[in-house]
């Protein structure tokens, strides 16, 4: 654990079809359960909850995006949920059914413990990793950077 620092992450996915489409019903139906499991997971600190620009792609200029913005106590805690939680993994195995491939869909960065990132900051981090690849300001699971 990184005393005084937490890990923020944004991941985005672009739906193949419009929201509410029967093709994505299984994904949309699973969101509440997956979010509840995340909130109960060891190391979970915060997640963006809301409607409008807090949950959709309006900040990104794309209404087919779904956005997940969370803060965890450590990269290990985030990885444990993302890769070892069976319910989350089951949803992730089906992602190609629902989403198109994006050049950059995940960015992680360090925040002070107790801080909550804005969606605008998260978008800037995702843009940064898309432009430059992993850096200390925006990285991924394969190329993590230590806290400042």
Indicate residue ranges for each PLM-predicted region.
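An amphipathic, aromatic/His-enriched active-site/gating alpha helix that lines ligand/cofactor pockets
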Residues: 75-103
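Tryptophan-centric aromatic hotspots in well-structured domains and transmembrane helices
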Residues: 46, 71-72, 98-99
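Short S/T/G/P-rich N-terminal loop/turn motif that feeds into the first structured element of a domain
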Residues: 1-65, 77, 104-148
